[in-house]
């Protein structure tokens, strides 16, 4: 069965989310003990696992809430020390993607001309981008997935290895993958100010983690290939622009869509402001001009259609003033938990419909499949048949 956009509606609050996570972990233990993959019914249980980003009380032994103390004790007993440490680490910057957003991203990629190929999903969580992949794309694709969190990676294997997906439990920075060999890198990398675990002396080694993922992904795709990520608004709106200059030198920004602040509130329990960014790798590295413009930050005039505030101090990437139709909602100023100010995007409409309207306005057919080679023909037996699972 293919997962519907409403699949996670039952786990939008803390207690059901915790219970679904525990049920998924227990099922994973059973599958591993029995040495088998998940059935379609079991897949539905595993795919309700949404990580621990909004469930810090379950990880916090110092909580004074007696109900969460009991859940914390249950979780400590259920997980090994290594798994528990991995859960804590992943809770800091891992936000699972709503399926409605995943489906819109695949629609966008199809409109751009992507029909299948060699696909990489770094930081895959439990494979929600695989769950939302159209079967006509899956039928023509080979897929590699990378996930740092041990439990999430094992769940992805339990669900998708039977269909040929190759899953690596590793840092994206450390996993050995062939550069320049992928047609598409897609996903929702971690957000955060911390640097990557990159050991090589590359220009992007010290980028913040979400910007690093873009740079590494562009290293992985072939010229003409696509990178489509959900990312923190910091990629577009950070005052420091070194990462934007680097990304622009190796790829063209195809589109940027500012998502509403509540996009991740249900499945991930966070109101972080995010963007959908799609890049196409240039045929050769060049100090290209910013076309479209997206290098600098500018003040948002109160007269702008994207301004939802009387403040004259709102700043955003110049791209969104040139393309206000790509902002889903209106920008406003909000206080951070540390007493500072940030820009949020407020929207009260139908997000799925708004995304499809933006997708319909994207350019058509800019992606061209690579010419088939004898080596590619010999790999047909390895093509991922996710459509079998969907029947």
Go through each PLM region and give its residues:
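Class I S-adenosyl-L-methionine
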Residues: 3-159, 163
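Conserved Class I SAM-dependent methyltransferase catalytic core
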Residues: 148-150, 205-265, 272, 276-278
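Flexible, glycine-/basic-rich loop-and-beta segments that form/coincide
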Residues: 266-374
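Conserved SAM-binding strand-loop segment of SAM-dependent methyltransferases
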Residues: 162-172
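General small-molecule cofactor/ligand-binding pocket signal
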Residues: 144, 166-168, 257
